[in-house]
Amino acid sequence: MLRLVPLGLSWPLSLRRPNILRPDAAPPLFDQSALNYESLEDCCDPSSSSCSAMSLYSFNSERDTATFVHNANGRKFNKLNPLYKLPSDQPEFSRHDKQHELLKSALGGHLYPAPELVESVLSNIPNRRKAILDLGSGSGAWCIEMANKFEHADVVGVDLVANASRPTPSNCRFEFDDINLGLSHYYNQFDLVHSRAVVNGIDDFTRYVEDIVGCLRPEGVAILVEGDWRPYREDKITPYPLAGLGGNEGSWWGRICFEAFELMKKRGSSIDGGDEVEKGLHHPLLRDNQTASYFVPLGPWAIGDTEDYTADLKKQGQLMAENAKEFTGALSHLFEDAGLQSEVVSSWLDNVNAGMFNET
């Protein structure tokens, strides 16, 4: 039986539920003239909730790595946001790259849904630079590709830990920030705001949407992409039961994600924000709201109507399986923090890995 993961357009596993939003107006521009930090001490303690200008701090890898990152279980994790318990290191960035390629494939090779709308909003206008904001930029792949595609636009990627390992175009930059601290310093500055797979690190999804709206210029576009962890049958309606809860049939992928997301919610994450994205977001300053869900196979065995479509499905299934396997492995730190026995977690991971490429 084919297992499918719904993508609406996101979360670490898929492309789920994009919402494309356009404001009729936007709040006034925030005055940044007094903010020019040259050292972290001049800004504030990054662990303090009073620090709202972390994006304006220039990071020096030799000086500041210990301030932003700590080591645990052989992986690196961010220090800014206690809700986000996934790693922030090169293996995780590699997983992000696979997820990025998966989402592009599901979108027919595009970097975004509704390409005609997005490209119209980002069209080159003399004497006016376009601006793109990516919230939760991960490995930076999306930002860099957007900067190369739209050379007349400035691209800003924001994340808890930026990936500094790849060449960056001159019209692209990355900034450290905990977006839960607010984005008022970005208000009214961007033609496109892109957010993908961030809800597990967001503490107040409603406020987050308000900030996204604030960052948009009039007639700008927002794209939110979140994923659904629940695996579905081929009818794309019936979810698989969770393994280990009675009966002989069930999904260990679904089970371990269920356990992880319940822990995230108890810690204060707005995991259910993904469901809000799927339903469609509504705000008094937004119009032309659109939403869609995409499904990708959880394994490389799906068959399409044509050879080309079959090749696309197999590529998506392979990337999804690798992404899912690496994602579940990255959850160990979250489970350990919650006090789960390592033997139980290891058993879950073994079951996920054993079944990921098993068509039955």
Model-derived segments and their meaning:
Residues N200-I202:
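A short His-aromatic
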Residues D275, L286-G299:
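Conserved S-adenosyl-L-methionine
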Residues L2-Q189, R207, G227-N248, W252-R255, ...:
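N-terminal charged/capping segments associated with class I S-adenosyl-L-methionine
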Residues A197:
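Oxyanion-hole/transition-state-stabilizing segment in secreted/luminal serine hydrolases
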Residues S269-P284:
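Short alpha-helix
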Residues T206-I223:
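A short glycine-rich, Lys/Arg-flanked "PGG" loop and its adjoining helix->strand segment in the class I
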Residues H194:
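A conserved beta-strand element that flanks and buttresses the S-adenosyl-L-methionine
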